[in-house]
Protein backbone atom coordinates (compact mmCIF):
# COMPACT_ATOMS: atom_id res chain seq x y z
CA UNK A 1 0.00 0.00 0.00
CA UNK A 2 1.08 3.60 -0.53
CA UNK A 3 1.94 5.93 2.34
CA UNK A 4 -1.34 7.75 1.73
CA UNK A 5 -3.31 4.52 1.96
CA UNK A 6 -1.66 3.78 5.33
CA UNK A 7 -2.58 7.13 6.88
CA UNK A 8 -5.53 5.59 8.74
CA UNK A 9 -2.83 3.88 10.82
CA UNK A 10 0.22 6.13 10.70
CA UNK A 11 -1.71 9.32 11.47
CA UNK A 12 -1.99 7.91 14.99
CA UNK A 13 1.65 6.88 15.43
CA UNK A 14 3.52 10.14 16.11
CA UNK A 15 2.59 10.51 19.78
CA UNK A 16 3.61 6.92 20.46
CA UNK A 17 6.88 7.37 18.59
CA UNK A 18 7.64 10.47 20.63
CA UNK A 19 7.11 8.49 23.85
CA UNK A 20 9.46 5.72 22.69
CA UNK A 21 12.20 8.14 21.72
CA UNK A 22 11.81 10.17 24.90
CA UNK A 23 12.18 6.99 26.94
CA UNK A 24 15.52 6.29 25.21
CA UNK A 25 15.60 2.68 26.39
CA UNK A 26 18.67 0.64 25.42
CA UNK A 27 16.63 -2.40 24.34
CA UNK A 28 13.63 -2.03 22.03
CA UNK A 29 11.71 -4.50 19.87
CA UNK A 30 8.31 -4.97 18.26
CA UNK A 31 6.00 -7.73 19.47
CA UNK A 32 3.06 -8.73 17.27
CA UNK A 33 1.07 -11.91 17.66
CA UNK A 34 -1.89 -13.90 16.37
CA UNK A 35 -1.96 -12.13 13.03
CA UNK A 36 -4.25 -14.77 11.45
CA UNK A 37 -3.48 -13.10 8.13
CA UNK A 38 -6.39 -13.15 5.66
CA UNK A 39 -8.79 -14.87 8.07
CA UNK A 40 -10.76 -11.61 8.23
CA UNK A 41 -8.60 -9.38 6.05
CA UNK A 42 -4.94 -8.82 5.28
CA UNK A 43 -2.51 -7.88 8.05
CA UNK A 44 0.10 -6.84 5.50
CA UNK A 45 -0.88 -3.12 5.67
CA UNK A 46 -0.30 -3.20 9.43
CA UNK A 47 3.17 -4.65 8.89
CA UNK A 48 3.91 -2.13 6.14
CA UNK A 49 2.93 0.70 8.50
CA UNK A 50 5.77 -0.36 10.79
CA UNK A 51 8.23 1.20 8.33
CA UNK A 52 6.90 4.55 9.56
CA UNK A 53 7.84 3.61 13.13
CA UNK A 54 11.23 2.13 12.26
CA UNK A 55 12.20 5.18 10.22
CA UNK A 56 11.63 7.32 13.32
CA UNK A 57 12.78 4.91 16.06
CA UNK A 58 16.28 3.75 15.11
CA UNK A 59 16.68 2.01 18.47
CA UNK A 60 14.26 -0.81 17.58
CA UNK A 61 16.49 -3.84 17.04
CA UNK A 62 14.20 -6.70 16.02
CA UNK A 63 10.62 -7.96 15.70
CA UNK A 64 9.12 -10.95 17.47
CA UNK A 65 6.11 -12.71 15.97
CA UNK A 66 4.14 -14.61 18.58
CA UNK A 67 2.67 -17.13 16.15
CA UNK A 68 -0.59 -17.98 14.36
CA UNK A 69 0.52 -16.01 11.34
CA UNK A 70 -1.82 -17.09 8.53
CA UNK A 71 -5.23 -18.39 7.51
CA UNK A 72 -5.40 -22.08 8.38
CA UNK A 73 -9.18 -21.93 7.84
CA UNK A 74 -8.57 -21.86 4.09
CA UNK A 75 -9.43 -25.34 2.73
CA UNK A 76 -6.89 -24.90 -0.07
CA UNK A 77 -3.46 -25.97 1.26
CA UNK A 78 -1.69 -23.62 -1.15
CA UNK A 79 -3.99 -20.77 -0.13
CA UNK A 80 -3.09 -21.37 3.51
CA UNK A 81 0.61 -21.38 2.68
CA UNK A 82 0.27 -18.23 0.59
CA UNK A 83 -1.28 -16.37 3.53
CA UNK A 84 1.68 -17.44 5.66
CA UNK A 85 4.20 -16.39 3.03
CA UNK A 86 2.67 -12.97 2.47
CA UNK A 87 2.84 -12.02 6.15
CA UNK A 88 6.36 -13.40 6.54
CA UNK A 89 7.58 -11.54 3.45
CA UNK A 90 6.06 -8.32 4.78
CA UNK A 91 7.85 -8.77 8.11
CA UNK A 92 11.16 -9.67 6.46
CA UNK A 93 10.87 -6.55 4.30
CA UNK A 94 11.04 -4.37 7.41
CA UNK A 95 14.82 -4.65 7.33
CA UNK A 96 15.27 -5.80 10.94
CA UNK A 97 15.67 -9.37 12.23
CA UNK A 98 12.39 -11.26 12.63
CA UNK A 99 12.15 -13.98 15.28
CA UNK A 100 9.18 -16.34 15.28
CA UNK A 101 7.42 -18.42 17.88
CA UNK A 102 5.38 -21.12 16.14
CA UNK A 103 1.65 -21.02 16.93
CA UNK A 104 -0.83 -23.88 17.20
CA UNK A 105 -2.65 -22.69 14.05
CA UNK A 106 0.48 -22.46 11.93
CA UNK A 107 0.77 -26.08 10.79
CA UNK A 108 -2.91 -26.13 9.75
CA UNK A 109 -3.61 -29.46 11.44
CA UNK A 110 -6.28 -28.26 13.86
CA UNK A 111 -8.70 -27.17 11.16
CA UNK A 112 -7.75 -30.03 8.86
CA UNK A 113 -8.82 -32.49 11.55
CA UNK A 114 -11.91 -30.50 12.56
CA UNK A 115 -13.08 -30.15 8.94
CA UNK A 116 -12.05 -33.68 7.90
CA UNK A 117 -9.53 -32.39 5.40
CA UNK A 118 -6.44 -34.35 4.36
CA UNK A 119 -3.87 -33.76 7.11
CA UNK A 120 -1.05 -34.79 4.80
CA UNK A 121 -1.24 -31.20 3.56
CA UNK A 122 -0.04 -29.87 6.92
CA UNK A 123 3.02 -27.65 7.24
CA UNK A 124 5.55 -29.90 8.94
CA UNK A 125 8.47 -28.65 11.07
CA UNK A 126 11.09 -28.58 8.29
CA UNK A 127 8.84 -26.53 6.02
CA UNK A 128 7.95 -24.28 8.95
CA UNK A 129 11.65 -23.70 9.57
CA UNK A 130 12.16 -22.61 5.97
CA UNK A 131 9.18 -20.27 6.23
CA UNK A 132 9.83 -18.67 9.61
CA UNK A 133 13.50 -19.32 10.35
CA UNK A 134 15.39 -16.77 8.27
CA UNK A 135 17.07 -15.38 11.41
CA UNK A 136 17.11 -18.66 13.32
CA UNK A 137 20.75 -19.78 13.71
CA UNK A 138 19.78 -23.41 14.46
CA UNK A 139 18.06 -26.27 12.67
CA UNK A 140 15.28 -26.37 15.28
CA UNK A 141 12.20 -24.18 15.63
CA UNK A 142 13.33 -23.06 19.08
CA UNK A 143 16.46 -21.05 19.81
CA UNK A 144 17.89 -18.03 21.59
CA UNK A 145 19.88 -14.93 20.72
CA UNK A 146 22.13 -12.82 22.95
CA UNK A 147 22.01 -9.03 22.92
CA UNK A 148 24.40 -6.63 24.65
CA UNK A 149 23.30 -3.15 25.70
CA UNK A 150 24.75 -0.32 27.74
CA UNK A 151 22.18 -1.18 30.41
CA UNK A 152 22.95 -4.90 30.62
CA UNK A 153 23.30 -8.11 28.65
CA UNK A 154 20.22 -10.12 27.72
CA UNK A 155 19.16 -13.43 26.23
CA UNK A 156 15.96 -13.73 24.17
CA UNK A 157 14.58 -17.28 24.14
CA UNK A 158 12.04 -18.27 21.48
CA UNK A 159 10.13 -21.47 22.24
CA UNK A 160 8.22 -23.80 19.93
CA UNK A 161 4.90 -24.64 21.58
CA UNK A 162 3.93 -27.01 18.75
CA UNK A 163 6.84 -29.37 19.33
CA UNK A 164 4.59 -32.42 19.21
CA UNK A 165 5.25 -35.81 17.60
CA UNK A 166 4.34 -35.62 13.92
CA UNK A 167 3.49 -39.30 13.66
CA UNK A 168 0.86 -40.70 11.31
CA UNK A 169 -1.91 -43.17 12.07
CA UNK A 170 -2.75 -46.30 10.10
CA UNK A 171 -4.37 -44.16 7.40
CA UNK A 172 -1.34 -41.94 6.97
CA UNK A 173 -3.06 -39.02 8.72
CA UNK A 174 -1.64 -36.81 11.47
CA UNK A 175 -3.87 -37.15 14.56
CA UNK A 176 -2.67 -34.25 16.73
CA UNK A 177 -4.31 -30.95 15.83
CA UNK A 178 -4.47 -27.97 18.17
CA UNK A 179 -2.11 -29.71 20.55
CA UNK A 180 0.33 -27.44 22.38
CA UNK A 181 3.46 -29.24 23.50
CA UNK A 182 7.05 -28.80 24.59
CA UNK A 183 9.00 -31.97 23.83
CA UNK A 184 11.38 -33.52 26.33
CA UNK A 185 14.24 -32.63 23.97
CA UNK A 186 13.23 -28.97 23.94
CA UNK A 187 12.71 -28.95 27.71
CA UNK A 188 16.21 -30.35 28.28
CA UNK A 189 17.66 -27.75 25.90
CA UNK A 190 15.78 -25.03 27.76
CA UNK A 191 16.99 -26.16 31.18
CA UNK A 192 20.59 -26.95 30.27
CA UNK A 193 21.41 -24.45 27.52
CA UNK A 194 18.92 -21.60 27.23
CA UNK A 195 18.96 -20.90 30.97
CA UNK A 196 22.72 -21.47 31.29
CA UNK A 197 23.82 -17.83 31.21
CA UNK A 198 24.57 -14.88 33.45
CA UNK A 199 22.40 -12.67 31.24
CA UNK A 200 18.91 -11.46 31.99
CA UNK A 201 16.48 -13.73 30.14
CA UNK A 202 13.21 -12.95 28.37
CA UNK A 203 11.20 -16.00 27.28
CA UNK A 204 8.89 -15.67 24.28
CA UNK A 205 6.33 -18.35 23.40
CA UNK A 206 3.08 -18.60 21.49
CA UNK A 207 1.03 -19.84 24.42
CA UNK A 208 1.60 -19.04 28.08
CA UNK A 209 3.69 -21.63 29.88
CA UNK A 210 0.82 -21.86 32.36
CA UNK A 211 -2.81 -20.79 31.95
CA UNK A 212 -3.32 -20.27 35.68
CA UNK A 213 -4.97 -16.88 36.18
CA UNK A 214 -4.71 -15.92 32.50
CA UNK A 215 -7.81 -14.31 31.02
CA UNK A 216 -8.38 -15.34 27.44
CA UNK A 217 -10.67 -16.24 24.62
CA UNK A 218 -13.35 -18.73 23.75
CA UNK A 219 -16.87 -19.40 24.97
CA UNK A 220 -16.03 -20.25 28.57
CA UNK A 221 -18.12 -18.22 30.95
CA UNK A 222 -15.26 -17.22 33.20
CA UNK A 223 -12.79 -16.63 30.32
CA UNK A 224 -10.15 -18.55 32.25
CA UNK A 225 -8.07 -21.42 30.87
CA UNK A 226 -9.52 -21.24 27.37
CA UNK A 227 -7.52 -24.14 25.98
CA UNK A 228 -5.74 -27.18 27.30
CA UNK A 229 -2.59 -26.35 29.20
CA UNK A 230 0.70 -26.57 27.34
CA UNK A 231 2.00 -30.14 27.56
CA UNK A 232 5.41 -29.88 29.19
CA UNK A 233 4.52 -26.42 30.47
CA UNK A 234 4.67 -27.31 34.18
CA UNK A 235 8.26 -28.50 33.71
CA UNK A 236 9.30 -25.21 32.14
CA UNK A 237 7.29 -23.24 34.69
CA UNK A 238 9.22 -24.95 37.48
CA UNK A 239 12.54 -23.91 35.96
CA UNK A 240 11.62 -20.29 35.18
CA UNK A 241 10.45 -19.90 38.76
CA UNK A 242 13.72 -21.34 39.98
CA UNK A 243 16.07 -19.48 37.62
CA UNK A 244 16.00 -15.91 38.88
CA UNK A 245 17.73 -14.67 35.73
CA UNK A 246 14.42 -15.08 33.88
CA UNK A 247 12.97 -11.57 33.99
CA UNK A 248 9.65 -11.98 32.13
CA UNK A 249 7.54 -14.34 30.02
CA UNK A 250 5.89 -12.90 26.88
CA UNK A 251 3.28 -14.71 24.78
CA UNK A 252 0.14 -14.44 22.68
CA UNK A 253 -2.47 -17.13 21.96
CA UNK A 254 -5.22 -15.89 24.28
CA UNK A 255 -6.03 -12.72 22.28
CA UNK A 256 -6.07 -10.67 25.47
CA UNK A 257 -3.86 -8.19 27.30
CA UNK A 258 -2.69 -9.81 30.52
CA UNK A 259 -0.02 -8.87 33.02
CA UNK A 260 0.09 -11.43 35.79
CA UNK A 261 2.78 -11.74 38.44
CA UNK A 262 3.74 -15.23 39.54
CA UNK A 263 5.43 -14.04 42.72
CA UNK A 264 8.37 -12.06 41.26
CA UNK A 265 7.98 -13.22 37.63
CA UNK A 266 5.68 -11.27 35.27
CA UNK A 267 3.74 -13.12 32.59
CA UNK A 268 2.59 -10.90 29.73
CA UNK A 269 0.17 -11.58 26.87
CA UNK A 270 -0.88 -9.27 24.03
CA UNK A 271 -4.03 -8.77 21.97
CA UNK A 272 -4.37 -10.39 18.56
CA UNK A 273 -3.03 -8.26 15.74
CA UNK A 274 -6.21 -7.91 13.69
CA UNK A 275 -9.82 -7.08 14.49
CA UNK A 276 -11.14 -9.98 16.56
CA UNK A 277 -12.78 -9.27 19.90
CA UNK A 278 -12.87 -12.67 21.52
CA UNK A 279 -13.63 -11.73 25.12
CA UNK A 280 -15.90 -9.09 26.69
CA UNK A 281 -12.98 -7.24 28.25
CA UNK A 282 -11.25 -6.67 24.90
CA UNK A 283 -11.44 -3.24 23.25
CA UNK A 284 -13.73 -2.74 20.27
CA UNK A 285 -12.09 -3.21 16.86
CA UNK A 286 -13.10 -1.54 13.60
CA UNK A 287 -11.66 -2.27 10.16
CA UNK A 288 -9.69 0.47 8.40
CA UNK A 289 -9.27 2.43 11.61
CA UNK A 290 -6.41 2.45 14.09
CA UNK A 291 -8.29 -0.10 16.23
CA UNK A 292 -8.09 -2.78 13.56
CA UNK A 293 -4.64 -3.66 14.83
CA UNK A 294 -2.80 -4.11 18.12
CA UNK A 295 0.94 -4.56 18.58
CA UNK A 296 3.55 -3.32 21.03
CA UNK A 297 6.95 -1.72 20.97
CA UNK A 298 8.64 -3.40 23.93
CA UNK A 299 11.26 -1.25 25.66
CA UNK A 300 13.44 -2.42 28.54
CA UNK A 301 15.14 0.15 30.70
CA UNK A 302 16.57 -0.74 34.08
CA UNK A 303 14.02 -2.70 36.07
CA UNK A 304 11.02 -1.73 33.93
CA UNK A 305 9.49 -2.98 30.69
CA UNK A 306 7.40 -0.46 28.77
CA UNK A 307 4.89 -1.77 26.23
CA UNK A 308 3.83 1.06 23.93
CA UNK A 309 0.62 0.07 22.18
CA UNK A 310 -0.05 0.85 18.55
CA UNK A 311 -3.73 0.27 17.85
CA UNK A 312 -6.48 -1.00 20.13
CA UNK A 313 -5.72 -1.18 23.82
CA UNK A 314 -3.48 0.87 26.07
CA UNK A 315 0.18 1.33 26.93
CA UNK A 316 1.38 -0.92 29.73
CA UNK A 317 4.23 -0.92 32.21
CA UNK A 318 5.74 -4.04 33.77
CA UNK A 319 7.83 -4.14 36.92
CA UNK A 320 10.81 -6.43 36.30
CA UNK A 321 11.16 -7.36 39.94
CA UNK A 322 14.03 -9.75 39.40
CA UNK A 323 16.01 -7.12 37.48
CA UNK A 324 15.74 -4.88 40.52
CA UNK A 325 17.31 -7.59 42.62
CA UNK A 326 20.31 -7.61 40.28
CA UNK A 327 20.70 -3.86 40.75
CA UNK A 328 20.73 -4.10 44.51
CA UNK A 329 22.30 -7.51 44.99
CA UNK A 330 24.91 -7.38 42.28
CA UNK A 331 23.98 -10.42 40.23
CA UNK A 332 21.39 -12.91 39.06
CA UNK A 333 20.44 -15.64 41.48
CA UNK A 334 20.30 -19.21 40.22
CA UNK A 335 19.00 -21.34 43.03
Can you say where each PLM-predicted feature lies in the sequence?
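Extended active-site neighborhood of metal-dependent phosphoesterases/phosphodiesterases
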Residues: 8-14, 74-192, 235-236, 242-245, ...
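Active-site glycine-centered loops adjacent to acidic/histidine catalytic or metal-binding residues
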Residues: 34, 67-68, 103-104, 206, ...
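Short active-site segment of divalent metal-dependent hydrolases/proteases
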Residues: 37, 70-71, 106, 209, ...
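N-terminal active-site segment of His-dependent metallophosphoesterases
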Residues: 2-79
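His/acidic metal-ligating clusters that form di-metal
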Residues: 13-23, 52-63, 92-93, 155-158, ...
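Short, surface-exposed beta-strand-loop junctions and turns on beta-sheet-rich folds
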Residues: 313-315
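Short, solvent-exposed beta-strand-to-loop segments that form ligand-recognition rims
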Residues: 324
Amino acid sequence: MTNEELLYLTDHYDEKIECINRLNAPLNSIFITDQHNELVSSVVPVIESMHYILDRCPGIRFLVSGGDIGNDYNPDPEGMRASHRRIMEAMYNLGIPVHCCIGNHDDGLGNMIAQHWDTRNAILPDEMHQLCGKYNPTDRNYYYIDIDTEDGDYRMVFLDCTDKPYLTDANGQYPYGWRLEISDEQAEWFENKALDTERGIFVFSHSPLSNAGIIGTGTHRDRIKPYDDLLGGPRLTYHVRKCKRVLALISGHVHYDNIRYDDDLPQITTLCALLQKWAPGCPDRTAETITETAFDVVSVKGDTMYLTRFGAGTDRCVDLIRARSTIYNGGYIHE
